[in-house]
């Protein structure tokens, strides 16, 4: 543990193995069977327990929890482990849990992965290299994720599923089956169903104007002609309706995204 930098408030159990130039920030708790390889950095308030190994140059941010027992009723304190490779970035509130007897006794993470805030990696998962997990992705147990996969925020993957190499899963997707390599998976996107009439009424908007604006957006999103022409026609037709004018102004602004699809 030569050249290691350990904050005075960190709790390092006897038996912990530290490589060179390891940095352990305030209030971290490290168990006795943990191995931290060279240049690992724990920012602060990181908890690492169990039989756990963290590869070199991995950086772990506050309130992450690594190597805790699996969340299964059958767990019987077996000596399972958590192995994390090199050059990983593990952001705030990430949880990576140890393996179990029913899954090879090991949860394994490869190299060069990015785990954004709140990601959960369940017991016995096998994660490849160069994978991106966006915020609050949740993997159940026994899941395999191939190299270079990208999983969008708030997506959840069912136990035993396989996520193929170079695949992409869109945000908010419930994944209950295998995803082929190079596959693109997405759940149904949010649609525009109308106007927030109840909220508008509560804020004092004129009811007649609100209902008229609802008719206007129906004409914009589902009328005849191209979209730009419909916007122009509606702007002329409802030029005395301040709500419609505000919507038209928004539609005419530059944007890098499309508008939510209208479904009445």
Swiss-Prot record:
From which domain of life does this come?
Bacteria
UniProt-listed Enzyme Commission number(s): 2.3.1.129
Supply the alphabetized keyword list: Acyltransferase, Cytoplasm, Lipid A biosynthesis, Lipid biosynthesis, Lipid metabolism, Repeat, Transferase
The record's Gene Ontology biological-process terms are: lipid A biosynthetic process
> In the record, what terms sit under GO molecular function?
acyl-[acyl-carrier-protein]-UDP-N-acetylglucosamine O-acyltransferase activity
Q: Which reaction does it catalyse?
A: a (3R)-hydroxyacyl-[ACP] + UDP-N-acetyl-alpha-D-glucosamine = a UDP-3-O-[(3R)-3-hydroxyacyl]-N-acetyl-alpha-D-glucosamine + holo-[ACP]
- GO annotation, cellular component aspect: cytoplasm; membrane
**Which InterPro entries would you find in this protein's record?**
Acetyltransf_C (IPR029098), Acetyltransf_C_sf (IPR037157), Hexapep (IPR001451), Hexapep_transf_CS (IPR018357), Lipid_A_LpxA (IPR010137), Trimer_LpxA-like_sf (IPR011004)
Pfam families xref list: Acetyltransf_11 (PF13720), Hexapep (PF00132)
Q: Which residues form a coiled coil?
A: none
Quaternary structure and partners: Homotrimer.
The name this protein carries in UniProt is Acyl-[acyl-carrier-protein]--UDP-N-acetylglucosamine O-acyltransferase
List the source organism: Rickettsia peacockii (strain Rustic)
């Amino acid at each position: 543990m030569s050249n290691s930098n350990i904050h005075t408030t960190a709790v390092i159990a006897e038996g912990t193995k530290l490589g060179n130039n390891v940095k352990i920030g305030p209030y971290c708790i490290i168990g006795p069977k943990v191995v931290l390889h060279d240049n690992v950095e724990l920012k602060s308030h990181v908890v690492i327990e169990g039989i756990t190994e963290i590869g070199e140059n991995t950086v772990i941010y506050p309130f992450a929890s690594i190597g805790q027992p699996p969340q299964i009723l059958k767990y019987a304190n077996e000596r399972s482990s958590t192995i994390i490779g090199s050059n990983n970035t593990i952001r705030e509130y990430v949880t990576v849990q140890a393996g179990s007897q029913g899954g090879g006794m090991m949860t394994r993470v490869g190299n060069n992965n990015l785990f954004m805030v709140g990601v959960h990696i369940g017991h016995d998962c096998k994660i490849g290299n160069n994978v991106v997990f966006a915020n609050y992705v949740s993997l159940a147990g026994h899941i395999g994720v191939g190299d270079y996969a990208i999983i969008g925020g708030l997506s959840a993957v069912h136990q035993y599923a396989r996520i193929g190499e170079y695949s992409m899963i869109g945000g908010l997707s419930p994944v209950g089956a295998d995803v082929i390599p190079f596959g693109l998976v997405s759940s149904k996107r949010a649609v525009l169903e109308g106007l927030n009439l109840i909220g508008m009424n509560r804020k004092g908007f004129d009811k007649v104007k609100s209902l008229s604006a609802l008719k206007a957006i129906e004409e914009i999103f589902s009328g005849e002609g191209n979209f730009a022409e419909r916007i122009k026609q509606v702007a002329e037709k409802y030029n005395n309706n301040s709500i419609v004018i505000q919507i038209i102004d928004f539609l005419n602004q530059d944007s890098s995204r499309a508008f939510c699809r209208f479904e009445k």
